[in-house]
Each structure stands twice: as C-alpha cells, then as structure tokens.
C-alpha cells in the first residue's frame, strides 16, 4: 500500500503497463467515503509522508499482533467487502475519518489535521516503509561495493524511526527498493500490513461503530434501468450535495495479465468510477474508498479486501480538494491507452481497481496542483517487478514537475546542478560514453546528455535553467530540441523510458512560464520534429508519443485553442509521415482519441477533428489509405457526438471525393486493361467499355464525379494506340450507354455527354481521330432512341463540351462541324426511314408544326371541295376548250387561296407569330406547374387538397397531360420530403396520431395516394387513346 501524493519515490504511484488489450467492461463493488467540513478538524498531527514519524515499541508490537491475528483467523462464512464513503458533519468539531481522501489542507509545513489520513499513514504506509528498509539493510550486507553499502546504510540509519522520506524520495535508491520488493517474504508482509491496516481503519472510523461522519457503504442506484451504469449522490451532514459518483460496469471479452510468477490470469469484468477532480458544490471533506474487484468482477471477502482511496480535503474556500491518493502497490495497467484499467497482484491473486490510466493521471495532476509539489509517476517498482515476469514492455509514466519548483532549484548561486543521486560531496561527472558520439559534438547537447545520464529530473533542471536564463525564443527552442535529441539518443534508456521522458519534456515545455505561447508551440513542434527524424525509435512507438503529446497540448490551461491546433496539426503531419501504414493508422487514431477525451469544449473538439481530417485529406497518401483514416476520424467524431451536422457533412463530402477518386482510378485501370488485352477485338472492347460506362452511371457517386470519371476514360481511349475508327466505335458505345440509361435524369445525361466530348477534345491525339470520335458520340446518342427533343439537347451538349475544352479555336470549330455533320446525317436517315415506313392508316406523332401544316391542308381541302362542287361539269368529259377554260379558272382560284394560306402559315412561324418555341413552351409549362403547386399549398385540409387534385389534375382536360403529370410529380416529391425530414428529426411526436414534426403521417399518406391515383388515371387514359387507331382522311378529295 502506498500513498500517491506529490512526493517522489516510493510514496509515488508506480505504474507499469501490460500488452494485453482491454476490450470491454466490469462488475461494480460499492465505495466507502467520508466527508468533513472546515470546522471539524482540530487535530494538527503530521500529514505529509515526508514528515518525521516515530513509533514506540508498544505501537510496533501492537501492529505485529494485529497482523498475526488477521492471518490466523478463519471465517466459516466470508463477508463481501463494500465500497464506502465518510464525511465530517458540517456542524461537528470532530475530525473526519477517511480511507480515500484528506479532510485537512496540506500547509507549507506539511501538516494535516485529518485523523483518517493520519491513521492510514501510521498503520499502513509507514510500517510498509519500515519493512522495506529492513530488507534493504539485509541486501546491503551482501553488496560487493562495501563503500556504497555503508553509505546507504548510514542514510537509512540516520532516518531510522522517522518516515524515511529522504531515502525513498531519492531516485538513486530505486534499485535497492526494487531489489527488496523482489523478496517473496517481504511482499507477503507488505500485503498483510495493507489488509490489516485497512481493516483497522475502516473499523475504527466506521459510522456503524459510532464515529460521526464515519465510513458507511455507498447505496448505488441503477440509472435508466441500465445494468452497466449506477450512480450515488454523496452529501454532507447538512444535506448539501458534494458530488455524484458514476460507476460503469465493463463486461469485457476475456483478456489476460501476468502475475509475478508468470502465471496468466484471465480478466472477465471490471468497473470504472468517475472520481471527481474538481468539487465546488458544497463545503466539507470527503474520503472515497473503492474496493478492488477479483478478476471475474466480483467483490472479495472483507478479510481480503484492499482499496483504492481518494482523499478530498477542505480547501481555503471550504470546498473539497483532491489532496492525496492511497492505492495498493505496485499499481499496473492493462494496456498503454487512457482507458486501460488498473490492476494489482495481492496475496497471489489479481484484482482490478475502479480507475483507468487516464483518470489516474488526471487525479495525480490535481494532487500536484493542490499540494504544489512534484509528482513522480515513473513507476519504477512496477516496471522492475514485471521484469521478473519476463515482461519488459510496460510503459513508465513521465515525471511531472511544476515550473515553480524547477525555478527554485535553478535560482541558487551554484551554476552546476548536483543531482540527488550523486553524493553531496561529489560533483556530477559527465558520462558521455552513454551517448552515441558524432564526429563533432554540440557542447549544449553534451550538457543535456550529461544531465540525462543521471536522471530525467536533472535534465529538466538543466533545460529550465537555460530557459530562464535565455530570453531569445530561437535559442530556447534550440535548447528544447537538444534535450529531445539527448533523450532519444540515450543508449541506456529503453523505448518505454524514452517515451516517458519525451512526454515529461513536452509537459514541462507547455507549462513553463518562461516561454511565450508562440515559443511553446515552436518548442513542442521541435520535439515532434525530433521524434519524426529519430532513426532508432520504431514508428509504432513514435505514434504513442504523438498521442501523448497531443493530449498534453489540448489539456493545457496555458494555451489558446489556436496554439493547441498548431501543435495538433504538427503531430498529425508527423503521424502521416511514418513509414508503415499500421503506424500511421495508430497515430491518427490515437490523436483522434486524444482530441475526443480532452477537456476541450465540444465545439473546439469538432474544430480539432476537422483540422485532423483536413491534414489527412491534403496528404500525399493513397486514396485507399486516406479513405480509411478519414473514415475513422469521422466515425469516432460522430460516435462521440463532437462533430456538428455541418462538420459531419463537410468531412463526409471530403470522404466522398476520396471514394469517388478511388473508384475513378480503379475504373480507368480497368479500361486500360481492356484496351491492352490482345484477346479483345474492337467489338469486344466496345462492349466491355460500355459495361464500365454503365457501372459508372449506376454508381451512387454524384453526377459531377460520374462526368469526370467518363471524361478520364474517354481520354484513355482517345490516347490509346487503336486506329481512329476503333476509337470512334468505342466512344459511340459510350454515347449509346449514356443516352439509353434507364434511371439517369435527362439533365445528368446531358452533363455527362458534355464531359465525354470534353475528354475527346482535350485528348492528345490527331484531329482526324477526334473528329471521328465526336461523330461516334453523336451517333451513339441517336442510337439511344430517345425523344427527338431530348436527342436534340444531347447533341447540343456535344457542342457545349467542345466549348468547355481547352482545345484551340480552330480544332473546336472543326469538331463542331463534325458533330453537326453527324447530326444532319442521322436526321436525314431518320426522315428517309420515316417516309419509307409511312402508313396513313396509323397514327403519327404530332408536333406543333405538323398540326399547323395539317390545318393548312384541311383548309385547302375545304376550299377546293366547294369550288369543284360549284363546277360539276368538270367531272364530265366536255369539249376540250370548255374544260381547259374552266380548269384554268379553278386552278387560278385554288392558287390564290393556297398563296393566302401559305402566307398565313409563314406568319405563324415568324418570330411575331403565335407558334411557341420549345423553350417558350417549357417556360409556360413550368410557370403553370408552379402556379398549381402554389395553389395546392393554400389548401389547409386533407379534403380540400383531395378535391383540388380531382378538379385540376384529373377532370380538367384543358390542361395538357405533361403539365398535369409534372404537377403531380412535384407534389409527390414535396410530400415525400416532408415525411422524410419529419421522421429524421422528430421534434414533435405522439404515438396515437403519429404526428412527427408537425406532419400528420396518416394525412400525408392519403394525399400521396390521391396523387398517385391521379397520375395512373392520366397515363391509362393516354394509353387508351394510343391503342385506338385513328383513320386519317386524305387532305384532298377524291377525283
């Protein structure tokens, strides 16, 4: 058991990582907590673990007896351990007991007035330190270096009967502490002290035993009937809420961790508790003590229970402050990510604690902030213990050192820093042999390496001394860069230690008050650049450094969002520059996670993720990798609900573009393979490329991207070594595939044809080949056999594609002439074939010009018939002279009438006539449709709307079929869109009426049904008319 405060050495929280990956979540136990107010702590006993502590012989004997009694006990029926809390009543004068929090502020002289904290120190922490010291003395007796052994023995003896804080706080003594902890007997003693100590403290300061504000079990309540989330509200005695604790059960896929003897233990379930960091609701002190769970997620018996405890002491403003953490040691984490759960080995068993790596680090930083001292999180004890297991992959944590302490250490008159691990009477000697020696060694870098050769703390002291002395920003950046280089080049450090030291340097840079914000950004970016250029660190390990660096930058309170984003973008650049794709994925995923889990506002998190996405999008990676990385960022952002709808849309658009580009490249490659295939003749190639064209048209990408894709495919065909006619045949096939496509809208077909012709015009090939391909495209359009008006628009699209190209003017005109020539040829062919197939007994398609011409013919017939009837003698054979005379008169009359009618016909066809052009007819039609839709919108009730549909869209035959069908389609689209938007974003919802966002779904369905019935009625009527042959009369009467 150790107290995790802000003191280096054994009191600190030692961590080590295992490589097992946490995959799901665990079963909760119940917490014990205590709370106290500022009037309830008259005790002024020692609090700081560095302060002196004396034990009487009677106290030692009593403690040993308690331990023996505990291990000699047998309990026929074991009771489960509970979580608990305790608090000091707001009006009480009694001290507050706590296992997991402090109820008194730590003053500058390291005093505390909290009896629970004092009890934990006296019954658990100090006895454990004494036992370790005894074991170290035994180990020293066998040490070969007798001078060193004697020196260390004196250090321990000088502190004997005290807290041994100086010895345990000296980094140079860690190897002796680690060796002692390898002793199995010592480990058993430490575990027994911990269990017996907790049992004693929990019993002594229990509310059930009459201690006011003492420990009592937490009453968890399920949240929203969910089995994996529980909560409880902790209040002081006045009923004021101190905090709400949330507990999440994590039922995970089984993963294994290793015990000290190498045995693998499977973890099936654990829990996470969201320990509060800041408390500002009510006054008082609070102690939260959470029992460690067994590997299967169940609670141990009370006689085997150990606890993770958070001590919250009343601060200057009366509000609880997180002052200290008590937890079993060595503390390890099942992974290197912030979500990795903490676990311990105790009594030969594995237990999980209700805290993750990320939460633990966050709590330790708050402890540091509230006590104003450094916190050593390097976890050397745990790391060395895992070496016994054969596991050296664990990642030690960084040394976190506040600037004020660093300044105090460098403002002394001494110019040379004397590291704590070096005897006070010996100067620090450079150990340059530890570092790789270039031909010319930078003296500053050598100094940094020298400082690092003793401890990371000395390197930070060295760096901060330089940053305080040097005011030039560029030189400050150089110094930070030198330190980063020294860390990564240190041959004595393994990867884990290098990572920890880089993180420590980054945090020191961000929090250093001697640096301007811009210099901080440049300094951190220099560290990132050093990581990028380092040749010894594997890329996967670099990606972890990047994630940690981003987390430090984003969570800093000393930087503005703009500066944080600059550091983020640099980290992303470095991540994208890593050599293997797995490391790049790990880096970007890690950076994304750091953004989501940061303390930024939701809006700022969204902005940061957009910056990550932009960097990925602008990179030179393959489209496939961009798609993977950007898709992961978008998915994580959406799941975490930190991206606004606009940001999601923007990122999705970028992703769509990448996907489309990837698809385009794949299809171009397919076409290149078809063209190069010697087994394919022209017909086979045409068919294959037609199929590719159809695939493009069928794909869900936007019409614009489809056009770009087919434009690129056309260029590939045009620039292939095929002869001109073969190219023309292939392009003809593409044109036919576009013109005859079943689902594309006419406007999309037209824009796609423009793109294909643009590809022809801009291709690098002979003009004659381009002309042949242009003609082929026009012929393909005609092969589509569309409505003549639509075909005409498509042929015009060919000319527009030529205009939009970068071809020279002379080539553009030549290509337009070729297009017009091909269109004229096809129109002539169609006319000839139409005349050959003409059958007056069958109905013909009628356009306006045909109708007007028929009117003229009918008018001529109506004139000729009366004239002939007025001269019946013309039907008889009469004298030749009379016949000629009368015939001449009749023909003269007919001629006059014909001229009159022709002139009238010409007038109608003139610009001033009343024959409307296609564009004018479309405009009138659109206007009428809009008027009908608008009028429909004024009908408020379902009945009025249904009546409108019947009267105007079914019964009113004065309106053309086209206008009525267009109106129906537009109204159907509006109704469908209303319902889709309403269901997607339900602002108003009642289950009985099914009204969503103000849209009555039942009425909506009725109206859509009426519209579809009207459409079917019109179509059926039209089909009926077409199926009835119309017998046409000749324009002229029989002779």
Swiss-Prot record:
Biased composition (Low complexity): 85-114
Record's compositionally biased regions (Basic and acidic residues): 54-69, 1030-1039
Compartments, as annotated in UniProt: Cytoplasm
Keywords, ordered alphabetically: Cytoplasm
Disordered: annotated span: 1-115, 408-438, 1020-1039
Primary location recorded for the protein, binned into one broad class: cytoplasm
UniProt-listed InterPro entries: Rickettsia_antigen_120kDa
Gene Ontology terms: cellular component: cytoplasm
Ranges of Polar residues composition bias in the record: 31-44, 424-438
Domain of life: Bacteria
Stated name of the protein: Antigenic heat-stable 120 kDa protein
Biological source species: Rickettsia felis (strain ATCC VR-1525 / URRWXCal2) (Rickettsia azadi)
Gene designation: sca4
